[in-house]
Design a protein with these regions (language model features):
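Positively charged n-region of N-terminal signal peptides that target proteins for export
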Residues: 1-4
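Local beta-strand/beta-hairpin segments that build beta-sheet-rich folds
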Residues: 25-35, 120-121
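Short acidic-glycine-tyrosine-enriched beta hairpin
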Residues: 78-95
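Short, conserved beta-strand element in jelly-roll/cupin
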Residues: 57-72
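Ligand-binding loop in jelly-roll beta-barrel domains
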Residues: 68, 95-118
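Bacterial N-terminal signal peptides
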Residues: 7-16
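Conserved short histidine dyad/triad with adjacent acidic residue
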Residues: 41-57
Length: 127
């Protein structure tokens, strides 16, 4: 009984921590889920110059820029990268945890397509 309760508590704690890093949860004023199914989730992200997100994580994703913007991403190890985008830019982003900051003079507006991993039992489809 004691072992079951401990396992249940750990599961809840881990689940809460994992959910807390979902950008739609950590920054709901900026990230809007516009489509979600078993394969993908599409997020509409908007912010203003000087805005900074809470630390969050994304699975493998594709970013599509709808506006020009300049952004700083800071990773958990303290390293950071600065990227500038123009409307129509498309970029693959490997799974990562970061804090995002709009360091430019224009609003950010992007669509993020997040890829969900197939279940372990999924069989590849032949082309």
């Amino acid at each position: 009984m004691r072992r079951t309760n401990l396992a249940s508590c750990l599961f809840v704690l881990v689940s809460a921590t994992a959910g807390a890093q979902d950008p739609a949860v950590t920054d709901p004023d900026r990230y809007k889920v516009i489509l979600e199914n078993e394969h993908t989730r599409v997020l509409d992200y908007k912010d203003h110059p000087g805005d900074r997100t809470t630390q969050h994580k994304h699975p493998d994703s594709v970013l599509y820029a709808l506006s020009p913007f300049k952004r700083k991403l800071t990773f958990p190890d303290g390293k950071s990268v600065i990227k500038a985008f123009n409307p129509g830019d498309v970029m693959f982003i490997p799974a990562q945890t970061h804090i995002g900051e709009n360091i430019g003079k224009t609003d950010t507006h992007v669509l993020l397509v997040e890829f969900k991993k197939p279940p372990p039992s999924a069989k590849p489809v032949n082309p």
